[in-house]
């Protein structure tokens, strides 16, 4: 559900806990902070359909900013802080951002971008530099009540650019008043985490990956929308992750194969040091997981490991649980959103066992397009 419901409903229950610092944002604070952000964006003249970009480390205000943009009907783009300044500049300009938010942690990057982002409202968390105003100071001037014209925004994340310039994955903005009924809400991956992974308001979700990636951003948003609690690691560390599972009684988590590998390379004393009994669902994706690595993880954690295959476009979703994987080792599961086709360069189906390009069949490819690139959109949705 929406922060406007969860705030009054769950009040002082933690929505976000930063595992390293211990900083907490409650559901009511998430509601109020996102209202203040939305009020700020409207005061700057941003209207539904406009764009905002933000680049920061795993920061406690990452999701209050994302929810503020969502409540404002904006397209919001989270950018990797590991990119070069020229790459960041390209994305900010390509997405048409009218607001750019970063943090003091990335001060050097901010300084190098200041002159190239003329005409863009620039804000910084935890301090100021050059042409960047304090985001916290600005929102503190704003009311904590909702803006009058709330409507549903959408994330517009950029692909990795492995086949050229990064491409923004865009979806249409729904200009209708924002729904406050759970069955109408389409916030993040709420339905996925609820339906496929049995998440609810009592879930406690561990997020160890960079938040600017589509999966951590979407899954955290989904859990928060249910009224759950997200425990966010500032950065991944094998022992710190295990300690967090014990300390916060984690029920759900999400990983990538390199994290599994780093777990398994750790001292056995560390692996057996922590109580992991609360852990019910461990989700992984992002890259192929070596069979022997997954076998060892299931031996260690038990049959709680779930895998999926999808993309930022979310035009397809394939998933399997541990039992299904053990009976078909190497699989990523069955499609949940329609048939899959493996085609050759001439768009012909290839026989089982042969390589080809993966195509998901579905209604208008789930409504996505590549921002400013009709040809690539046409090529990806034929």
Model-predicted regions and their roles:
Residues 335, 348-380:
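Conserved ATP/PPi-binding loop(s) of AMP-dependent carboxylate-activating enzymes
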Residues 15-59, 84-89:
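Conserved AMP-binding/adenylate-forming core of the ANL superfamily
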Residues 20, 108-157, 165, 171-190, ...:
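ANL superfamily adenylate-forming
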Residues 2-26, 127:
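AMP-dependent adenylate-forming
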Residues 178-208, 212-252, 266:
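Conserved AMP-binding/adenylation subdomain of ANL enzymes
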Residues 4-5, 42, 60-79, 88-89, ...:
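Hydrophobic alpha-helical segments in the ANL/AMP-binding
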Residues 53-55, 62, 66, 70-101, ...:
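Short beta-strand->loop structural element characteristic of the AMP-binding/adenylate-forming
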Residues 155-157, 161, 225, 250-255, ...:
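Gly/Ser/Thr-rich phosphate-binding loop
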